[in-house]
């Protein structure tokens, strides 16, 4: 049994707390997933972990969207969709 029972309280400690950073949210999310995958959490703790995980995923998506928007503003027209290679030469930018 790789996980100690002490890992479970983090799933429900502060369910609405905003993570300090994207990296902190991802680390907490990884811990929650590992706890849930272990199968050792009781039903209520699993539900709390799922809810917290959903909050963390939403937070991470929002952070990524904000960062993407900032990159778009900084790069202007330099960004092209990944599949749009027909009119660009990636080597020509160097």
From Swiss-Prot:
Which EC class is this protein assigned? hydrolase
Assigned GO CC terms: cytosol; exodeoxyribonuclease VII complex
GO terms of biological process kind: DNA catabolic process
Q: Which catalytic reaction applies to this protein?
A: Exonucleolytic cleavage in either 5'- to 3'- or 3'- to 5'-direction to yield nucleoside 5'-phosphates
Q: Which GO terms describe its molecular function?
A: exodeoxyribonuclease VII activity
Map out region (Disordered) in residue numbers.
1-21
What protein does this entry describe? Exodeoxyribonuclease 7 small subunit
State the organism named in the record: Ralstonia pickettii (strain 12J)
> What is the organism lineage in this UniProt record?
Bacteria, Pseudomonadati, Pseudomonadota, Betaproteobacteria, Burkholderiales
The gene name on file is xseB
């Amino acid at each position: 049994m790789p996980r100690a029972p002490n890992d479970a309280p983090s799933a429900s400690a502060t369910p609405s707390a905003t993570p300090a950073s994207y990296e902190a949210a991802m680390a907490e999310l990884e811990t929650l997933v590992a706890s849930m995958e272990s199968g050792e959490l009781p039903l209520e703790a699993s539900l709390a972990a799922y809810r917290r995980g959903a909050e963390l995923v939403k937070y991470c998506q929002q952070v990524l969207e904000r960062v993407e928007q900032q990159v778009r503003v900084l790069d202007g027209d330099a960004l092209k969709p990944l599949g749009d290679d027909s009119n660009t030469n990636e080597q020509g930018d160097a």
